[in-house]
């Protein structure tokens, strides 16, 4: 079993100011978005100009941050924030939801498209291939922080990793499983899936490869966005089987996690949209 390397979450600290790895992962994601966006403009595969891409980035950042935070509040810890509403603004303490961020970006795309006279689906198709590497960057940020670890796996698995931050979850799991209790006593930690890296590979690298390559030629309007939607939903649904369920929610109906249930409509809409738009002529 490998022990998580325990990175310092603060990259640089100057007086009261601190630059955190997790914040840097978001910044890197936005840089990658801009870089890939400019490549697509040069290839003639974008509805953006260089100027409008930079303008949209501001809208997108607001959508990610506001949507991600509100999504986390509503989907995961609503009762806690209802009791302490001012904690909603403590974004430095963590707590972001991809599904909320996704909805925030969709709203930003709709508003931006209305302002600039760009069709919603055409804009979605343009944005979709630029997103997955940013998701990959965010998962690396999760790994560096030692958060969102995976479920318990076999002690002899070469990929097994112990997370010191999971002490409470380790104790709780060991209390219900004699073998795990033995492992915990012997090794001090339980072997877990490094699910952040699985999500990095699936939702980040694999999704990027699929959507980027598919969108290298003109496709029917809406099909690229549908591929991203369904692809993310499928990859996230799979990765959630290795990820530790949120301690304040656990597993829900049918033994699925909140992340899986939120991914189901993405999968359905993505598949239906991909087939439906694919039956139309390119325009």
From Swiss-Prot:
Pfam families, alphabetized: LGT
One GO-annotated biological process of the protein: lipoprotein biosynthetic process
UniProt binding sites for a 1,2-diacyl-sn-glycero-3-phospho-(1'-sn-glycerol): 139
Known pathway: Protein modification; lipoprotein biosynthesis (diacylglyceryl transfer)
Membrane spanning residue stretches: 17-37, 56-76, 92-112, 117-137, 194-214, 222-242, 255-275
Record has Calcium as a keyword: no
Keywords: Cell inner membrane, Cell membrane, Membrane, Transferase, Transmembrane, Transmembrane helix
Its membrane topology: Multi-pass membrane protein
Amino-acid biosynthesis among keywords: no
Chief localization: membrane
One MF term in the entry's GO annotations: phosphatidylglycerol-prolipoprotein diacylglyceryl transferase activity
Record's subcellular location: Cell inner membrane
Any one annotated GO CC term: plasma membrane
InterPro entries tied to this protein: Lgt
Annotated EC: 2.5.1.145
Function: Catalyzes the transfer of the diacylglyceryl group from phosphatidylglycerol to the sulfhydryl group of the N-terminal cysteine of a prolipoprotein, the first step in the formation of mature lipoproteins.
Family per similarity comment: Belongs to the Lgt family.
Name by which UniProt lists this protein: Phosphatidylglycerol--prolipoprotein diacylglyceryl transferase
Naturally occurring in which organism (per UniProt): Neisseria meningitidis serogroup A / serotype 4A (strain DSM 15465 / Z2491)
Gene: lgt
């Amino acid at each position: 079993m490998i022990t998580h390397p325990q990175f310092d979450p603060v990259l640089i600290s100057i007086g009261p100011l601190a630059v955190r790895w997790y914040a840097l992962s978001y910044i890197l994601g936005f840089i990658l978005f801009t870089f890939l966006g400019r490549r697509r403009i040069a290839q003639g595969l974008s509805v953006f100009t260089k100027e409008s891409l930079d303008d949209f980035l501001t809208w997108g950042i607001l959508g990610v941050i506001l949507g991600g935070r509100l999504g986390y509040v509503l989907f995961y810890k609503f009762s806690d924030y209802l009791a302490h509403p001012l904690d909603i603004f403590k974004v430095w303490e963590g707590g972001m939801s991809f599904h909320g961020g996704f909805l925030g970006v969709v709203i930003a795309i709709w508003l931006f498209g209305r302002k600039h006279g760009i069709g919603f689906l055409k804009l979605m198709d343009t944005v979709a291939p630029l997103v997955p590497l940013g998701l990959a960057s965010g998962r690396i940020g999760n790994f560096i922080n030692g958060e969102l670890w995976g479920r318990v796996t076999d002690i002899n698995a070469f990929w097994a990793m112990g997370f010191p931050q999971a002490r409470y979850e380790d104790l709780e799991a060991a209390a219900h499983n004699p073998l795990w209790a033995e492992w915990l006593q012997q090794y001090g930690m339980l072997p877990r899936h490094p699910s952040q890296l699985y999500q990095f590979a699936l939702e980040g690298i694999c999704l990027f490869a699929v959507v980027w390559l598919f969108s290298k030629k003109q496709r029917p309007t809406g099909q690229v966005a549908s591929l991203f939607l369904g692809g993310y939903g499928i990859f996230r649904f799979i990765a959630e089987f290795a990820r530790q369920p949120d301690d304040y929610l656990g597993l829900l109906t049918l033994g699925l996690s909140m992340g899986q249930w939120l991914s189901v409509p993405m999968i359905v809409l993505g598949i239906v949209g991909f087939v439906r738009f694919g039956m139309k002529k390119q325009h």
